């Protein structure tokens, strides 16, 4: 089964958004206690931090998570969240992950997201997995 994996700080903005999706999701721990490993394809939901400053926009917990071979391998897409006050760096962490790991940036939303964002993300995720599964079938044919 495909899931969402997400990181949320103590503000819980991303957590609250992901809960509204009603999709199976696993949270990257705030405190790196032990290796957190995903063993199936997933989409990463990631907020941008530190006013979108490039060097620190991706939380270190996410960097550590993606430095694990399994986690890197199963990453299939990314959804970014952020604050529009960051200007051109709005959702920059999603852009960074998308480029670095060569996965599509599927959607961007601000802070807690709107009801429209929830609908768009749910529909987009369903379409994305269907497309990915179809491509996989065609490769195996």
Swiss-Prot record:
<dbReference type="InterPro" id="IPR029039">
    <property type="entry name" value="Flavoprotein-like_sf"/>
</dbReference>
<dbReference type="InterPro" id="IPR020852">
    <property type="entry name" value="RNR_Ib_NrdI_bac"/>
</dbReference>
<comment type="function">
    <text>Probably involved in ribonucleotide reductase function.</text>
</comment>
<protein>
    <recommendedName>
        <fullName>Protein NrdI</fullName>
    </recommendedName>
</protein>
<dbReference type="GO" id="GO:0010181">
    <property type="term" value="F:FMN binding"/>
</dbReference>
<dbReference type="GO" id="GO:0036211">
    <property type="term" value="P:protein modification process"/>
</dbReference>
<dbReference type="InterPro" id="IPR004465">
    <property type="entry name" value="RNR_NrdI"/>
</dbReference>
<dbReference type="Pfam" id="PF07972">
    <property type="entry name" value="Flavodoxin_NdrI"/>
</dbReference>
<comment type="similarity">
    <text>Belongs to the NrdI family.</text>
</comment>
């Amino acid at each position: 089964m495909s899931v969402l994996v997400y990181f949320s700080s103590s503000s819980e903005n991303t957590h609250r958004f992901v809960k509204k999706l009603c999709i199976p999701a696993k949270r990257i721990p705030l405190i790196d206690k032990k290796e957190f490993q995903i063993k199936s394809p997933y989409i990463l939901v990631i907020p941008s931090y530190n006013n979108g400053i490039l060097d620190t926009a991706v939380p270190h917990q996410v960097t550590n998570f993606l430095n694990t071979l399994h986690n890197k391998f199963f990453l299939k897409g990314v959804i970014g969240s952020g604050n529009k006050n960051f200007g051109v760096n709005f959702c920059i962490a999603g852009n960074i992950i998308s480029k670095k790991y060569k996965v599509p940036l599927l959607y961007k939303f601000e802070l807690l997201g709107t009801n429209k964002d929830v609908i768009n993300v749910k529909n987009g995720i369903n379409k994305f997995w269907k497309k990915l599964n179809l491509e996989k079938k065609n490769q195996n044919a």
